[in-house]
Amino acid sequence: MAVGFKVGYYWFQVGTSDFLHSFFSTICIRLEHGKWGRVYPKLMGELYQGCLKNQDLNEGLEELHKVRKELKNFSPSDVIWDAEDLSLTPPWGNNISSDITDLSNYFVTSDGRDLISVLSEAMNEAKEMQCDIEIDNL
């Protein structure tokens, strides 16, 4: 089942729920020292739980910008597939594109786009439309 970001009547495709969970798990373990939502409460708390309200989008975008900057400091091998079970690895292992140079560009959606860019675009669209952004299944 496909998961993505819903903004009003717009859909921003991500991929599988496991893949999106990996993105948030990587943030938790690598940038929040295993304390989910402690550093990035809007992204990790509110959005991950399903919805980031319109009034919190500016703060969410600031957090996302910091996440991208911080993830540049980690190699692709530092990816976390599941914060609850650190023994799990991505199904593709280390077989990744040479275009992926660090964790800031590791996460690519099922339609080939950079996940952080897609999320930023969705959040900006939500700001423009004055609505919330939700994680939803297609």
Where do the PLM segments sit?
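Acidic (Asp/Glu-rich) sequence patches and key acidic residues
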Residues: 1-121, 125-138
